[in-house]
């Protein structure tokens, strides 16, 4: 079962002591079309998860996101959890994060970067 986190809760966790790692798992074509990402996120190709999932630290919290929080990020989070990782997917993906952040005070310039 895939577990999720909404943009508001993620924002709170990112300012906490044990902030999760952020992994952008948009398909390569989506990422290349719009390379903006949540600050400090790393992009990983979801189609090559076998190549990178074992490099992640076990037990460390991670949040993955795709464009809309659909099947891409959900399937990657499921796969990560099968490897024993504490993985959540971002509800609504980067689209929801961006829409949510535009109304947040002072965060819009920090939230997305190229």
Task: Show which residues each predicted segment covers.
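Rhodanese-like catalytic fold shared by cysteine-dependent sulfurtransferases
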Residues: 1-21, 28-63, 68-114
């Amino acid at each position: 079962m895939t577990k999720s986190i909404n943009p508001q809760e993620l924002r709170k966790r990112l300012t906490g002591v044990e902030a999760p790692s952020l992994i952008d798992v948009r398909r390569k074509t989506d990422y290349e079309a719009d390379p903006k990402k949540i600050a400090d996120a790393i992009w990983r190709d979801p189609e090559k998860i076998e190549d990178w999932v074992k490099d992640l630290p076990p037990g460390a919290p991670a949040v993955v996101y795709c464009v809309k929080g659909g099947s891409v990020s959900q399937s990657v989070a499921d796969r990560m959890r099968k490897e024993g990782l504490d993985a959540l997917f971002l509800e609504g993906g980067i689209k929801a994060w961006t829409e949510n952040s535009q109304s947040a005070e002072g965060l819009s310039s920090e939230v997305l970067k190229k």
